[in-house]
Amino acid sequence: MKILLLGSNGQVGWELKRSLAPLGAVTALTRHSEKGLSGDLADPDALAATVQSVRPDIIVNAAAYTAVDRTESEPERAKLINAQAPARLAQEAKSAGAWLIHYSTDYVFDGSGSTPWQETDPPSPINVYGRTKLEGEEAIGQSGCQHLIFRTSWVYASQGRNFLRTMLKLAAEKESLRVVDDQIGAPTGAELIADVTAHAIRAIEREPGLSGTYHLTAAGETSWWAYARLIIDTAAKAGMDLKVSARDVVPVPSKEFPTPAPRPGNSRLDATKLKDVFGLSLPAWEDGVVRAVQEITQPGGDRAFFRNHLL
């Protein structure tokens, strides 16, 4: 099996390089050209040429424009990367008879209510990021290519830029922390996303009728405030030198942190379909968060990195 992986230097892409390696020959690309191949989603023509050159059986697109607030001032670039490039990849996948695996977001929904969103619920994004990601989903679906679209939320890893690492940095620097407590979702590790992806690829080899959209998150739900408390408590128990304890994290409403792009209050995603179709049991969100913090704080991890406040 030949796999073309785009966005291989991102949080999810980094883990995919590990999880996909046993499945076949992986061509892992970043947005920079390498050996005449391009993984730059801002250049759909170069992407198409790369697909035609590699001739993969599976295309895994882990690249996206994910700077949510910046997309409000750069909507055309967001549309190019999040919508037009996936559309072109889908066309090439259809022509080549390849599968396209693509990652999307809870931001395709408006965040209303308190019930977990199902795949059949009508999308209604409230910001540019969500709208462009939805356009990418729709283009893939309309292309007729065999595909898996995984919607996920609150992605983190022990490396890269994410909420988990930001909280550790701030807890080492600040005397107090204020974190929003009225946005609810499930922190989902890049490691889990990559492992589920590899499992799904094995499944579609046997059952090509599994093409479609699936929600992929860790089990359970929490607020950003409670999430931050677990991060800090776990790091403190591991011996990390912090100025803030978990009990010092103050819950505040979202209105106290206005952002260019509005955030959904309800980011819950119902992963029942994924579990039933692929025969999976998804771990509790706390398990992955504790593991990621322990990876950072263990000897040889990023403890010194955070001590120097370099994020």
Question: Across the structure, where does each feature detected by a protein language model lie?
Answer:
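Mid/C-terminal beta-alpha module of Rossmann-like enzyme folds, strongest
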Residues: 196-197, 203-258, 304, 308
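Rossmann-fold cofactor-recognition segment
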Residues: 30-45
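NAD(P)-dependent short-chain dehydrogenase/reductase
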Residues: 141-199
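Amphipathic terminal alpha-helices
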Residues: 285-311
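SDR active-site strand-loop-helix element
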Residues: 6, 29, 62-63, 100-105, ...
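N-terminal Rossmann NAD(P)H-binding glycine-rich loop of SDR-like oxidoreductase domains
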Residues: 1-22
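Catalytic helix-loop patch of NAD(P)-dependent Rossmann-fold dehydrogenases
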Residues: 73, 80, 85-88, 95, ...
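NAD(P)H-binding glycine-rich loop region in Rossmannoid oxidoreductase-like domains
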Residues: 41-81
